[in-house]
């Protein structure tokens, strides 16, 4: 259903900047060039999927922040995709006058280090077998995994035979791949994907080359695990990351220093930002309520796990985390 959600944040103007294609975000450390002392630490980012080279633009914008970390999603719509970027219209020092409704490109709001944030990623997929090392590749095509033809590995991991065409193709269509760089972990000891994993679709198979094509350029040395969407895993993983966030900000077991600060003079109490002020949840338009068991079921899980905090979000055509789409 069409909807509008609004979160009002009590953040001083010197600690954030709204940016867009007509009011770009200055690289961290270059704020003085335009008379501002603002240094972006992280950013909430919206992007148009139709923009050429959008993954590269996301990575480049992340490099403009001191942390190199951005979060958000691709704008999605039943019809025309637009982005709203409303600055201070010249009435707030350092905020600029560029405001409007935009098509294409990137927009969002950057925050400095004084605006404390915690971010987590949930994939909602389970690996069907161990992670493999890509040992031969050509663009989007995985030619070999662990020095075996990639198609042979796919058949073994999914327990299928492509000669049995219809059941095999149905299972391949329900399968995705989780990708990581060589130095990043792929699967945790508990069996879930690590936060660094990027989940991508399988876009084709090449029996002639015994290869598998995926929706991302791959390189030799990267790690790949075949995976499938799993409703129970998605619910458990969503609950887990919310619990991690709550524990990071409101630990059940306090350290001696924190306990002492809470009982001491209010001037040395923990910074208010350590208490959860609000949350933004970016979900995948490809799964939504039905995947979690009913309308709004996904948001109800987040609400229960985080507690009674202001909560907004949106369904994205693709999620943005770290420097990745």
What is the predicted role of each segment?
Residues 1-279, 284-291, 304, 314-325:
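Small-residue-enriched flexible segments
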Residues 58, 295-299:
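Amphipathic alpha-helical segments in well-structured domains
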Residues 298-312:
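Catalytic phosphate/nucleotide-handling subdomain of diverse soluble enzymes
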């Amino acid at each position: 259903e069409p909807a509008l959600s609004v979160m009002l944040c009590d953040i001083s103007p010197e600690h954030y900047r709204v940016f867009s294609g007509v009011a770009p975000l200055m690289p961290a450390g270059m704020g003085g060039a335009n008379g501002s002392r603002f240094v972006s630490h992280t950013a909430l980012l919206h992007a148009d999927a139709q923009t050429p080279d959008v993954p590269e633009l996301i990575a480049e914008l992340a490099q403009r922040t001191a942390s190199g970390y951005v979060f958000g999603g691709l704008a999605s719509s039943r019809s025309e995709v637009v982005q709203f970027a409303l600055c201070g219209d010249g009435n707030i020092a350092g905020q600029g006058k560029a405001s409007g409704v935009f098509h294409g490109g990137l927009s969002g709001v950057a925050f400095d280090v004084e605006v404390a944030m915690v971010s987590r990623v949930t994939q909602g997929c389970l690996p069907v077998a161990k992670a493999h090392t890509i040992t031969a590749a050509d663009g989007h095509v995985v030619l070999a995994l662990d020095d075996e033809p990639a198609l042979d590995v796919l058949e073994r991991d999914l327990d299928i035979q492509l000669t049995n065409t219809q059941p095999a193709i149905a299972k391949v269509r329900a399968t995705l791949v989780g990708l990581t760089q060589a130095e990043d972990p792929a699967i945790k000891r508990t069996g879930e994907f690590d936060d660094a994993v990027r989940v991508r679709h399988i876009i084709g198979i090449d029996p002639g080359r015994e290869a598998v094509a995926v929706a991302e350029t791959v390189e030799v040395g990267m790690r790949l695990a075949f995976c499938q969407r799993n409703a129970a895993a998605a619910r458990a993983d969503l609950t887990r990351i919310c619990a991690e966030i709550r524990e990071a900000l409101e630990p059940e077991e306090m350290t001696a220093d924190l306990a002492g600060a809470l009982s001491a003079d209010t001037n040395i109490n923990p910074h208010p930002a350590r208490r959860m002020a609000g949350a933004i949840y970016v979900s995948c338009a490809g799964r939504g309520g039905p995947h979690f068991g009913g309308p709004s079921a996904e948001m109800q899980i987040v609400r229960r796990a985080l507690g009674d905090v202001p909560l907004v979000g949106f369904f994205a055509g693709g999620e943005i985390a770290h420097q990745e789409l």
